[in-house]
Amino acid sequence: MARLKDKFSNEIAPALQQKFNYKNVMQIPKLEKVVINVGVGEAIQNSKAIDAAVGDLSKITGQKPVVTRAKKSIAAFKLRTGMPIGTKVTLRGDRMYEFVDRLMNVALPRVRDFHGVSDKAFDGRGNYTLGIKEQLIFPEIEYDKIDKVRGMDIIFVTTAKTDEEARELLGMLGMPFRK
């Protein structure tokens, strides 16, 4: 069992139930899934760029990413419908908890001038989005092997009804919010 999942069921869930006075254990907010998205704009000119992004993302998450394709053609960007423009991975269960654990305890502390993540990136429905500027913060990525520094979006989808509940949940899981 993942370390963070164990901590959630033994410590965090009872604390949340007490704080928000939930009558039923099913009301306790929990992490549903984590979606990691890498937009690869240069894939329009260079088709090899998408393969590099897929490789990086599979090393980071331990799961094969799905290639996202353009829904519409946009002439100004020389983009056609169906062209690959990014990759994404949806993590659930133990893999999700292991990734979140690695992100919070290993990757985020490696960011230069890191003072915590913004607590303003909640969407009003209890989901949190985190933008990362470079994939090098993950120890699985070797500096010499990358072709280009790429950023990524990490979306934490929770069952929380409000942002306050989601903030409390992520804070207890170890998300380093800015003071």
Curated annotation (Swiss-Prot):
GO CC annotation: ribonucleoprotein complex; ribosome
Superkingdom, natural source: Bacteria
GO molecular function: rRNA binding; structural constituent of ribosome; tRNA binding
Record-linked SUPFAM superfamilies: RL5-like (SSF55282)
Matches recorded under Pfam families: Ribosomal_L5, Ribosomal_L5_C
Biological process (GO), any one: translation
Coiled coil (UniProt feature): none
Keyword check for DNA damage: no
InterPro entries attached to this UniProt entry: Ribosomal_uL5, Ribosomal_uL5_bac-type, Ribosomal_uL5_C, Ribosomal_uL5_CS, Ribosomal_uL5_dom_sf, Ribosomal_uL5_N
Stored PROSITE patterns: RIBOSOMAL_L5 (PS00358)
Keywords, comma-separated and alphabetical: Ribonucleoprotein, Ribosomal protein, RNA-binding, rRNA-binding, tRNA-binding
Regions that span the bilayer: none
Membership in a protein family: Belongs to the universal ribosomal protein uL5 family.
Record's subunit section: Part of the 50S ribosomal subunit; part of the 5S rRNA/L5/L18/L25 subcomplex. Contacts the 5S rRNA and the P site tRNA. Forms a bridge to the 30S subunit in the 70S ribosome.
PANTHER family noted in UniProt: 60S RIBOSOMAL PROTEIN L11-RELATED
Function: This is one of the proteins that bind and probably mediate the attachment of the 5S RNA into the large ribosomal subunit, where it forms part of the central protuberance. In the 70S ribosome it contacts protein S13 of the 30S subunit (bridge B1b), connecting the 2 subunits; this bridge is implicated in subunit movement. Contacts the P site tRNA; the 5S rRNA and some of its associated proteins might help stabilize positioning of ribosome-bound tRNAs.
Protein name: Large ribosomal subunit protein uL5
Organism name: Desulfitobacterium hafniense (strain Y51)
